[in-house]
Amino acid sequence: MKYWPIFVQIGLLTSCNGQVKTNNPGDQNKAVSTTEGIVYFSNDFGQSWSNQSNGIPGDVFLTDISASGDLLGISTKQHGIYLYDFVSGEWTPIKRNKPISPDIDALLISENKIYAGTQGEGVFVSEDRGESWESINAGLENLTIRRLTVLDNRLYAGTNGGLFSFADEQNRWVRAYGNDNLQVNGIALLDNEIYIGTNKGAYKATLNQHNWRLILPDRSLHNISTADGIVYAMVYSELFASKDKGENWYGDQSGMPVGMYSFQVVEAGDIVLDGQWDGVYRKDNILNWVKLNTGLPIKIPVTEMRVWKNILVVASSQWCK
């Protein structure tokens, strides 16, 4: 069996009374190296973990993870973007030159470009690892960015006002689907079909066409993903799954806490992993999930997971022991 290294990343570290935890309580901005950690790596499908949090301030609120080529990055709400240095084993902040905001909700690294989606200021791109930034908002009708991804060599942005795709030939965004009231929280691809998870349900269409249709009504989704040929819809009380591309759905919560929702579902090699409110779960069979928290702090809401170079990166925010 092939093994895939795994990173787990934990965002804003809070105690149960809401106070930020650092090694020195008097220095909220000091880079942390605590038993709780902010980032964890695993080389054995989550069976064991090592804390790899050097360089990240203790008061960060992590928002996203992205990786491509030799770059692995995290975005935050206060401190901008950090890149991981595999030589030093530390996270280093990239420059926050104007006009980019330090308040970043969506991060995408693709073909040596870094895209940052902000809350209210649209999308920025850097082609020199953050030395300089350019705003790319032409045609973008909503500047609050929820998600950034590339599908079939085209850049997509999920916003608080619909799904947009970037037309390189025109150097501007065009609305792919939705209206000013459609919040797009997740974007996924399966067999040449694009899926979006929104505040008004799940929709799908053939890639690069406009034959959108509602496939999961009466549900508010905070994310959607595909893994092992299955579509996973993450609503605010349960995980739903579809084996027939959204035609039929079933609850897929067995083995995970009742009433607690999943943040992410990803495929790593021949296994499927779920980021839940209390840690990481592995799909044991078609009907059950098994917890994989050996070596991790207790009660970690794992909000982000990404696979990169045989590595899985997982993130969280606002947790307590």
Range-by-range predicted roles:
Residues 47-50, 88-92, 131-134, 170-174, ...:
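Beta-strand initiation motifs
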Residues 37-39, 78-81, 120-123, 161-164, ...:
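Loop/turn residues immediately N-terminal
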Residues 42-43, 83-84, 126-127, 165-167, ...:
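Conserved Ser/Thr-centered positions that define the repeating blades of beta-propeller domains
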Residues 17-58, 65-67, 72, 86, ...:
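An edge-strand/N-cap motif at the start of beta-rich repeat modules
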Residues 5-14:
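Bacterial N-terminal signal peptides
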Residues 22-26, 53-68, 95-110, 137-151, ...:
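Short coil-to-beta transitions that initiate beta-strands within beta-rich domains
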